């Protein structure tokens, strides 16, 4: 959520900025009307509250003197219903204004390139050289079919489209990847390993920005009278650990890592990536989350992105680093780097990690604060999140980049300790 003072004091300027850099239309006239009505109701409510307080004081004084207070009580009763109705109306219009504010995306940092979509993203760097094959290569679907490793047919019987059953050595490789990533981030990068719930309440989703805007992307379940949601990323659970908290300065930065199942409806994906495991309803990720002081978030963003890059480098997977433009960034982000891994079968780089600095956008929604040791006052923290990395896509990249002419897969050296020393599968 943006700073409310921007909506109250710089509405026209904010609307112009959102339109230019985010392609987001803010209804200025409607917001001005709401704000004007809020002020009117608030003034009326305060006047009635002041009148009630003065009458209550007069009643107390009269009673202490033994005087009859029936007329004063009648006066209070006469406007009490009006006061109650005014308080309800004020709360309703505040809720309406908050609903509008919750639907406004974050503003980008000044160094984020202006653009409409992914075509305007800016490549920052490349690592590794794509392998040249001396045989006809297969994609991960064909490689999986050769050995019965990837079973979409059984998954469809169990759950429907966009699910896959992993069998045998490839399931083991998938597990090895997740364990290796988590060990790297915990042992070498200083993240605390956290095991989090994958079913969360609506408050958690409002906190990180998935609700109210992206409800159609979420899987949900009804538990009695309460609706719960399956997480689309463990960023949700990890970040909300600091919701409504005041963190002492010496505890920052907080760095947390989690390996979890994730669930997405892919409502807006249309017919993209229907073949194979690129875009699934259920997948796994190792997620990184940092909570820090505002002045440290840019450095923390660079550090987090570098931690994700290290995963791809230790696996020997060629990748490129992309700075997303204003029109391609996520709703809550103020700056985002994507890492894209090379897939030989497609002859292109595909996203495998997204690392975002959200500034104080999520913190304001969650009321996540730190105590400034100089002023002694609580201030909003900055939150960051990044994939470190998507496990299924890493498995696909390993399968394709490490394939052999006979359809076997060479196991990257860093994974062999997790696979009892196996150097090849298939």
Curated annotation (Swiss-Prot):
Stated family: Belongs to the class-II aminoacyl-tRNA synthetase family. Type-1 seryl-tRNA synthetase subfamily.
Domain of life: Bacteria
GO biological process, one term: selenocysteine biosynthetic process
GO CC annotation terms, alphabetical: cytoplasm
Catalytic activity of the protein: tRNA(Ser) + L-serine + ATP = L-seryl-tRNA(Ser) + AMP + diphosphate + H(+); tRNA(Sec) + L-serine + ATP = L-seryl-tRNA(Sec) + AMP + diphosphate + H(+)
Protein name (database record): Serine--tRNA ligase
InterPro entries reported for this sequence: aa-tRNA-synt_IIb (IPR002314), aa-tRNA-synth_II (IPR006195), aa-tRNA-synth_II/BPL/LPL (IPR045864), Ser-tRNA-ligase_type_1 (IPR002317), Ser-tRNA-synth_1_N (IPR015866), SerRS_1_N_sf (IPR042103), SerRS_core (IPR033729), tRNA-bd_arm (IPR010978)
Keywords carried by this UniProt record: Aminoacyl-tRNA synthetase, ATP-binding, Cytoplasm, Ligase, Nucleotide-binding, Protein biosynthesis
Domain notes: Consists of two distinct domains, a catalytic core and a N-terminal extension that is involved in tRNA binding.
Binding locations of ATP: 264-266, 351-354
Subcellular location: Cytoplasm
Primary role: Catalyzes the attachment of serine to tRNA(Ser). Is also able to aminoacylate tRNA(Sec) with serine, to form the misacylated tRNA L-seryl-tRNA(Sec), which will be further converted into selenocysteinyl-tRNA(Sec).
Subunit structure and binding partners: Homodimer. The tRNA molecule binds across the dimer.
CDD domains, sorted: SerRS_core
Pathway(s) this gene product operates in, as recorded in its UniProt entry: Aminoacyl-tRNA biosynthesis; selenocysteinyl-tRNA(Sec) biosynthesis; L-seryl-tRNA(Sec) from L-serine and tRNA(Sec): step 1/1
Positions of L-serine binding: 233-235, 287, 387
The EC number(s) this enzyme carries: 6.1.1.11
């Amino acid at each position: 959520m943006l700073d409310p003072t921007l909506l109250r004091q710089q509405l026209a300027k904010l609307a112009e900025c959102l339109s230019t850099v985010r392609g987001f239309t803010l209804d200025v006239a409607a917001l001005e009307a709401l704000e004007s009505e809020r002020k009117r109701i608030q003034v009326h409510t305060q006047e009635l509250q002041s009148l009630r307080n003065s009458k209550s004081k007069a009643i107390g004084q009269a009673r202490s003197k033994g005087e009859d207070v029936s007329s004063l009580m009648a006066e209070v009763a006469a406007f009490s219903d009006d006061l109650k109705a005014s308080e309800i109306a004020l709360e309703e219009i505040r809720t309406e204004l908050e609903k509008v504010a919750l639907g406004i995306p974050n503003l980008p940092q000044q160094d984020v390139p202006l653009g409409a979509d992914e075509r305007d993203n800016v490549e920052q760097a490349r690592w590794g050289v794509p392998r040249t094959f001396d045989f006809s290569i297969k994609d991960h679907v064909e490689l999986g079919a050769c050995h019965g490793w990837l079973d979409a047919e059984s998954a469809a019987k169990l759950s429907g489209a966009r699910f896959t059953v992993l069998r045998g050595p490839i399931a083991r490789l998938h597990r090895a990847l997740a364990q290796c990533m988590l060990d790297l981030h915990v042992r070498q990068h200083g993240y605390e390993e956290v095991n989090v719930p994958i079913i969360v309440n609506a408050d958690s989703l409002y906190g990180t920005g998935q609700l109210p805007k992206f409800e159609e992307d979420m899987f949900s379940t009804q538990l009695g009278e309460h609706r719960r949601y399956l997480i689309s990323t463990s960023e949700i659970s990890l970040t909300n650990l600091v919701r409504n908290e005041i963190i002492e300065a010496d505890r920052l930065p907080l760095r947390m890592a989690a390996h979890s199942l994730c669930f997405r409806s892919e409502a807006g994906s249309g017919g993209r990536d229907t073949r194979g495991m690129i875009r699934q309803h259920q997948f796994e990720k190792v997620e990184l989350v940092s909570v820090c002081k505002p002045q440290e978030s840019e450095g923390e963003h660079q550090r987090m992105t570098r931690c994700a890059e290290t995963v791809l480098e230790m696996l020997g997977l060629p990748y490129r680093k992309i700075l997303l433009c204003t029109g391609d960034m996520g709703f809550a982000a103020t700056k985002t780097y994507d890492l894209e891994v090379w897939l030989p079968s497609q002859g292109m780089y595909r996203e495998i990690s997204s690392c975002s600095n959200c500034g104080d956008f999520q913190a304001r929604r969650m009321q996540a604060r730190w105590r400034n040791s100089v002023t002694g006052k609580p201030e909003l923290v900055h939150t960051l999140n990044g994939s470190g990395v998507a496990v299924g896509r890493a498995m696909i990249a390993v399968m394709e980049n490490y394939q052999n002419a006979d359809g076997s897969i060479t196991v990257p050296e860093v994974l062999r300790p997790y696979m009892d020393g196996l150097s090849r599968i298939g």
